[in-house]
C-alpha cells in the first residue's frame, strides 16, 4: 500500500470524539467514574460529543489480558466515519502489545489513510504516534482524558485549555507558543473528594532555557516520551522485539530536518537512564540529522538541574544544535 501523508480536518462543534483505552484500563474502574463525567462535561463545553468505545470501560485486569480488545476499539473508531477525533484515556506501559492486531490488519491500514482522525494522547501513546507516523497520519502529542480534560479543579488548566482549542476549527491560527507563567504539581488525591480543589502551583522562574546555541530553527515535529523510547530501543524485551518487527522507530533518513521533541514521565527516570536513551538516539543518527530539539519540563521539576546537565554532556559534540529545555508538554502540568 502506498503511504500518503494525511492530516485530519480540525474538529467542529457537534463532532463526535472517541475515547479509547489503548494502554492502562483505569478509566473503567469505579474510582474513575467521576473522571468520565468530568471529561464528558469538558468536551461538551468545546461543543464536542464524547463516544466511549465498547472496551474503553472494561477495566485494568480485562484490558491488560486482552490487548486485542484495545486494538478493536481503535479499529472501530477509524472505521466509523461519524467519529472525527480520538482521545486516549490515559497512558500506561504496554501499548506495544496492540501492534500485531493493528499492523497486520489491512482494513485498519486502509481506514487510517482514507478516514484520518484528530488523534491526541501522550506518554505510552508514543507507540501509537510512531505507528501512525509510519502509516502517514499526522497526530498530536497532547492532552488525554483523565489527566487533562478531567482536571479535578472547577476548570481545566488555562494553558491546557488553550492548547486543546487548537484542535478546533478556527483555533489553529499561527501564534507564538510561550512558556506558561505557572507550573502545577501533580496531585496526590484523585478521589471524588478532590473535585473542585485546585492544584498547588508555582511561579515559573526558568521559562524556556537554551541548552546549547541560541538560534532559530524549523522543521516538522517527531518524538515522544523517553520512558517509552527507552523500552522500545534500549531495554531487551518484548517491547524492543515489537519495535524491530514492525519497524516502529523512524529510520535515520526520516529524522533529517526534523525537530525532536522528548520528555520524561511521572516515574522520574534517573539521570543515568536519561543519558543511556540519549546516547542510543545519537547512535541511531537522530541527533546528527535533526534541526533542533524541544525538551519537556520534568514533572514537579524533579531532576530539573540534573537532567539539564545530562543534556549538556551528551550534546557537547553538537554545539550548533539548538535545544530548548523546559517546554510545557507531556507529563508536567500544564
What spans do the regions from the language model cover?
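Oxyanion-binding "anion nests"
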Residues: 221-271
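ATP/NTP phosphate-donor binding region
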Residues: 1-82
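Charged helix-capping and loop-helix junction motifs
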Residues: 33-36, 67-71, 103-104, 274-280, ...
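C-terminal active-site/capping subdomain that shapes the small-molecule cofactor and substrate pocket
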Residues: 264, 268-334
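Structural motif
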Residues: 87, 120, 259-263, 294
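Conserved anion/nucleotide-ligand pocket segment
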Residues: 138-227
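Long, hydrophobic/aromatic-enriched structural stretches that serve as scaffold segments
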Residues: 78-103
Amino acid at each position: 500500500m502506498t503511504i500518503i501523508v494525511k492530516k485530519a480536518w480540525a474538529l467542529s462543534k457537534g463532532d463526535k470524539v472517541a475515547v479509547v483505552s489503548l494502554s492502562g484500563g483505569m478509566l473503567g474502574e469505579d474510582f474513575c467514574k467521576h473522571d468520565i463525567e468530568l471529561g464528558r462535561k469538558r468536551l461538551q463545553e468545546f461543543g464536542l460529543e464524547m463516544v466511549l468505545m465498547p472496551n474503553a470501560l472494561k477495566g485494568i485486569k480485562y484490558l491488560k489480558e486482552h490487548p486485542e480488545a484495545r486494538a478493536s476499539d481503535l479499529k472501530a473508531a477509524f472505521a466509523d466515519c461519524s467519529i472525527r477525533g480520538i482521545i486516549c484515556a490515559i497512558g500506561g506501559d504496554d501499548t506495544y502489545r496492540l501492534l500485531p492486531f493493528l499492523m497486520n490488519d489491512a482494513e485498519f491500514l486502509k481506514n487510517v489513510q482514507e478516514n484520518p482522525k484528530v488523534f491526541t494522547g501522550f506518554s505510552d501513546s508514543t507507540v501509537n504516534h510512531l505507528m501512525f507516523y509510519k502509516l502517514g497520519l499526522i497526530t498530536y502529542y497532547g492532552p488525554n482524558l483523565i489527566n487533562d480534560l478531567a482536571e479535578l479543579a472547577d476548570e481545566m488548566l488555562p494553558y491546557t485549555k488553550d492548547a486543546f482549542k487548537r484542535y478546533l476549527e478556527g483555533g489553529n491560527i499561527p501564534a507564538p507558543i510561550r512558556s506558561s507563567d505557572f507550573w502545577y504539581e501533580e496531585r496526590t488525591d484523585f478521589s471524588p473528594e478532590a473535585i473542585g480543589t485546585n492544584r498547588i502551583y508555582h511561579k515559573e522562574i526558568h521559562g524556556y532555557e537554551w541548552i546549547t546555541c541560541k538560534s532559530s530553527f524549523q522543521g516538522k515535529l517527531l518524538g515522544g516520551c523517553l520512558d517509552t523510547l527507552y523500552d522500545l530501543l534500549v531495554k531487551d524485551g518484548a517491547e524492543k522485539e515489537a519495535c524491530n518487527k514492525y519497524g516502529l522507530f523512524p529510520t535515520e533518513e526520516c529524522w533529517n530536518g526534523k525537530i525532536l521533541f522528548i520528555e520524561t514521565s511521572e516515574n522520574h527516570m534517573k539521570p543515568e537512564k536519561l543519558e543511556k536513551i540519549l546516547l542510543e538516539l545519537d547512535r541511531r543518527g537522530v541527533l546528527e540529522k535533526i534541526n533542533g530539539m524541544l525538551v519537556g519540563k520534568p514533572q514537579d521539576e524533579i531532576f530539573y538541574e540534573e537532567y539539564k546537565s545530562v543534556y549538556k554532556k551528551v550534546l557537547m559534540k553538537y554545539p550548533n544544535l539548538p535545544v530548548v529545555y523546559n517546554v510545557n508538554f507531556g507529563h508536567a502540568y500544564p
